[in-house]
A protein has these predicted regions:
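Alpha-helical transmembrane segments of multi-pass membrane transporters/permeases
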Residues: 1-4, 61, 100-107, 117-142
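Residue-level recognition of pore/gate-forming positions within transmembrane alpha-helices
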Residues: 1, 5, 32-35, 71, ...
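Membrane-embedded alpha-helical segments of multi-pass transporters/permeases
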Residues: 9, 13, 40, 79-87, ...
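Transmembrane-helix boundary and interhelical linker motifs in polytopic inner-membrane proteins
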Residues: 19-23, 35-70, 118-124
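Signature of the first transmembrane helix
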Residues: 1-46, 138
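Membrane-interface helix-capping segments at transmembrane helix termini in multi-pass transporters
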Residues: 19-30, 55-66, 76-104, 147-156
Length: 173
């Protein structure tokens, strides 16, 4: 949505002003690694669930359940691989491996929940959850990075909090 893009656009100056160059590089590395690892570790289950929920309306519950199990397994796989982030090629991301895992889990769940909603034809809830998720991310980034001054930890918490709230809304609705 336009609101989501606007808030995301407004967060970039906040990040560049309050995070050091190294910290900003680590945040960028985390986004890059997650965008590469998520489809591999989860075997793109979010896309598969979308397809099979649409194709097989009689077995939607089991498809969604199996997909959630795969997402859980992907989170476990990423947790087991966290020591790899200590390699110098990841530019210090290993120092924030717990935060990285939280970010991975929240991103995986939000992506999965969005595709399940799309597959179940709950299209109206998708922009609502995306907007609320982005709003929570923006507010928490401001509170944690600017007001509390906790830097990169605040970044990781804020970019995890938004999707977790969005996922919770998908689950409730």
């Amino acid at each position: 949505t336009v609101a989501t893009k606007l808030i995301t656009f407004l967060l970039v100056p906040l990040y560049t002003y309050y995070l050091s160059t190294k910290e900003f590089g680590i945040t960028d590395m985390s986004l890059t690694v997650i965008s590469l690892v998520l489809p591999i570790a989860s075997m793109s289950i979010s896309d598969a669930v979308l397809r099979f929920v649409i194709d097989d309306s009689n077995d939607q519950k089991s498809v969604v359940s199996y997909g959630l199990i795969v997402i859980g397994l992907s989170c476990a796989i990423v947790a087991l691989l966290l020591p790899v982030l200590k390699l110098s090629v990841f530019g210090g991301l290993g120092n924030y491996s717990g935060y990285f895992l939280l970010m991975y889990v929240s991103t995986a769940l939000m992506t999965y929940a969005g595709n399940v909603a799309r597959g179940l034809n709950q299209i109206k809830i998708i922009p609502i959850c995306a907007s609320i998720s982005t709003l929570i991310t923006g507010i928490s980034a401001y509170l944690l990075i600017v007001r509390q001054g906790i830097g990169i930890q605040g970044y990781f918490i804020s970019v995890s909090a938004g999707p977790l709230v969005g996922t919770a809304i998908y689950t409730i609705v």
